[in-house]
């Protein structure tokens, strides 16, 4: 920041109010680069303009880029916390702690607010009257649990639309897996009582579940209903088998807890959350904070830990208790508890773990954080070497920290769509993915479609510029992209075309198992070819494949509901005959998704490899991504 501008902003800050609120710092391009909250806005913001010796290198860099500071007043400090988290989520400022998480972890959603509740896989916790359990580490594991609970407690698995329109029971009732509440073969009150066991199971109240089912089994045996008794016996054994696989921390606890630990150095910091539900560990979740050193003497660990808690629990399930690895003080503890209560509607205890059981959980989180940090850093260093090779081979002015790739897709004559995929530091940055419906082009015209997409993309000056654009195609597509960038005034951005070299077998319409990726550069006749095991190649081919996948999932979303076959059309290796076999065996796409690989592999024309591919691709569409349409 120029000296005169620095003094101008500093003088302006002196007039800030002393109330609570949120402040927004902007750079010369009027882009928000940092968002913070304060009990006293004037005192907090003025602290940035004190002697820079008291600041960390990151804060000094932030201050040097400040051109304007704005504020929003709030009635309370709790409101400031809530507003800060939502604004950070919306604007993603460069200098705020940004949670790096490769995916949104799945929850089990029990629609308890419905008249006839059912189970779903969910990627977000919403205030919709449902009960949420999780987060879990595997979508397939969640599907397996839902399938188990549906069978054990005879929970309906049909959609709400099917449920409301049925006039006679479906096959699920006929094979004894549902009680047909849709056609009133059971009252809604009795149905809810029947499925109550699944709720207790998910809450960890397993002794109650087993006791209740055992009583029903004995009653059925006394009445000589031996088939019913046998089914209940098998269900009890299945529940016991699942419980034996879970790590038990406290078998008497019914609390939901999260325990936090962290590990890091000058390369970054990894915060680990360990999720304990009713005394059982159901999973762990890593969150990497790049370029943040938790051991820096200038950084206040209480401040960044509270910032993490505020952002993390803006979107995630809030447990009964949060166990911390350090003491954040009474004032911040009470404030954080108020913030969490405001979000969840129920009391959450936040505390520094000092008891033996709590310390053991925090130590577990710390050890997981250390292990994941070392793996992440090793992987990150490989990515940096790959980006450095891209810079050298493509003769770029700087290392391409941000790479964007675009894919134009038209499926079976349907409307044309496009995807924008972003890699930052060599890995997917899904929060920056974008989807486009082509609005100005009729029919198939890739050049006009790409022109529209790039024009719309670069109207957003608030987005960071990429250091490289990857276009799927050879010299022709590269030439078109260069022409478009020149016409929209962005020829300063490097662009490369990615194409596959074909072998002679390709002329015979055979599938090419091994191809050589070729990269075409402006003004160069010969392509750049990387070694087959080069990290640079993994990054570049990875972003191309990701853009293609993301565009296809968009088509799938648009076509959802038009036909059962539409979702199966995208599964590689699945022809018409195999689709008919699947749809004959299973009632719906949801049933296929929840099937075991062994079930599918036993079908005529299927094997284990194909079964796992089908489940992977069908369930892939449920991975949480940033659903932003431009």
Swiss-Prot record:
Domain GIY-YIG as annotated: residue spans: 18-97
MF (Gene Ontology): DNA binding; excinuclease ABC activity
Gene name, Swiss-Prot/TrEMBL: uvrC
Location of the protein in the cell: Cytoplasm
Family under the similarity heading: Belongs to the UvrC family.
Subunit structure: Interacts with UvrB in an incision complex.
Pfam families: GIY-YIG, HHH_5, UVR, UvrC_RNaseH, UvrC_RNaseH_dom
GO biological process, one term: SOS response
Domain of life: Bacteria
Function: The UvrABC repair system catalyzes the recognition and processing of DNA lesions. UvrC both incises the 5' and 3' sides of the lesion. The N-terminal half is responsible for the 3' incision and the C-terminal half is responsible for the 5' incision.
Record NCBIfam families: PRK00558.1-5, uvrC
Official protein name in the record: UvrABC system protein C
Lineage, uppermost ranks: Bacteria, Pseudomonadati, Bdellovibrionota, Bdellovibrionia, Bdellovibrionales
Disulfide feature: none
UniProt key word rRNA-binding: no
GO CC terms of this entry: cytoplasm; excinuclease repair complex
Keywords attached to this entry: Cytoplasm, DNA damage, DNA excision, DNA repair, Excision nuclease, SOS response
Location of the UVR domain: 207-242
InterPro entries: GIY-YIG_endonuc (IPR000305), GIY-YIG_endonuc_sf (IPR035901), GIY-YIG_UvrC_Cho (IPR047296), RuvA_2-like (IPR010994), UVR_dom (IPR001943), UVR_dom_sf (IPR036876), UvrABC_protein_C (IPR050066), UvrC (IPR004791)
